[in-house]
Amino acid sequence: MPEKLFLTEQEVTFAEEKPILQRYEPGRINNQTIARIASNFHYCWEDEKIFALADKLRENESVMALGVVDRKGTVVGIIVRKDFFNTMVRPYARDVFRNHPVKEIMQETDRYDVNMNLFSVSEEISEDMRRPGVTYYVLTNEEGRFRGIFSTQDMLLYLSQITQSDIALARKLQSRIVRERDFVVGREFEFVASSRTAKGVGGDYYEIRQFEENL
């Protein structure tokens, strides 16, 4: 069968309408898995042109990072918006990268199974969370297919929310044990106590105990 040299009008239309910037739509998520904190779900093919992708990213300012996949859908790298545009503004970048594919400018990054336990991952990236800046990671399924992106910032925000929830719970429990105000009224006396702990949670307490009927 001879090789087809030209696309039909229908094929050209399909090629023009096919989005460069694509998005994975996550299904039901287990709250204990790392998928819970994924914040970016966009990806592109590794053979897309660099400047075509740059135009799409300018139109979608909320995309901070995206996965790069081959035509089988397997993850091969990542594009981080900040680093990508820092490269694009270099002298002669337009001439150098005009017709080059995205795979020539993508970055390598750590990959995690989308079903991995969230807290296990937090332990693995603990060193990265201590460093300045934001580090991005790719989520994949068992076949290596793209399933999203999360970052050290996403993890820190989630852990911060847990901390705030724990503090709120501790404050509620403490208020039940040590009331903010209490009083005892006897025939010849009144005893009033008040306690307000630092930031709503603390170790200070008071105790009222009657030893004898008239004391």
Predicted regions and their residues:
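Terminal presequence/propeptide segments associated with secretion/organelle targeting
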Residues: 1-14, 60
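Glycine-rich acetyl-CoA-binding "A-motif" of GNAT/NAT acetyltransferases
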Residues: 75-78, 145-146
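Amphipathic alpha-helical protein-interaction segments
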Residues: 135-141, 147-151
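Residue-level recognition of short loop/turn positions
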Residues: 71-72, 142-143, 212
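Tandem CBS (Bateman) regulatory domains
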Residues: 9-40, 80-134, 151-181
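… and, occasionally, acidic/histidine-rich disordered N-termini of signaling adaptors
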Residues: 162-215
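The conserved cystathionine-beta-synthase
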Residues: 43-63, 69-70, 112-134, 140
